[in-house]
């Protein structure tokens, strides 16, 4: 089963997205801030990380930078999630080390196609 780490501080967004992904057959673990996300990503075996970019403790930009130079998570695909779609955000996310970028509100079919493009069909 494909393991996804969802790093999201907003409880409503977190619960909705984790339930929707679980219904699609993904094993979803949750981190509620950037620091917890970095710690979990370094200690766990995840196939993909969904990273909210507006997080407490350390934001998603910095968390992604840290993961890209850390042992254990440096090659795990990361999709940036943001509600603040500003010009240049996609480029900023890619420069920080994200593999793709998606905007909130999340459209599940669009997100699933991005996940599939990064990790292929999950089992």
What are these regions (language model features)?
Residues 56, 74, 86:
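The feature encodes the CheY-like receiver
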Residues 45-50, 55:
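Active-site beta3 strand of CheY-like receiver
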Residues 25-32, 40:
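Short hydrophobic/Thr-rich beta-strand motif most characteristic of the beta2 strand and flanking loop
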Residues 8:
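Conserved acidic carboxylate
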Residues 18, 106-115:
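C-terminal output helix
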Residues 15-23:
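Charged docking surfaces used in two-component/phosphorelay signaling
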């Amino acid at each position: 089963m494909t393991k996804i780490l969802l790093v999201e501080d907003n409880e409503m967004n977190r619960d909705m997205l984790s339930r929707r992904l679980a219904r699609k057959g993904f094993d979803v673990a949750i981190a509620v801030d950037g620091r917890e996300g970095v710690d979990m990503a370094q200690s766990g075996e995840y196939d993909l990380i969904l990273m909210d970019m507006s997080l407490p403790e350390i934001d998603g930009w910095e968390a992604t930078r840290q993961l890209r130079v850390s042992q254990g998570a440096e090659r795990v695909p990361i999709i940036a999630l943001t509600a603040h779609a500003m010009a240049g955000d996609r480029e900023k996310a890619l420069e920080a080390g994200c593999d793709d970028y998606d905007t909130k509100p999340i459209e599940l079919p669009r997100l699933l196609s991005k996940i599939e493009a990064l990790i292929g069909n999950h089992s």
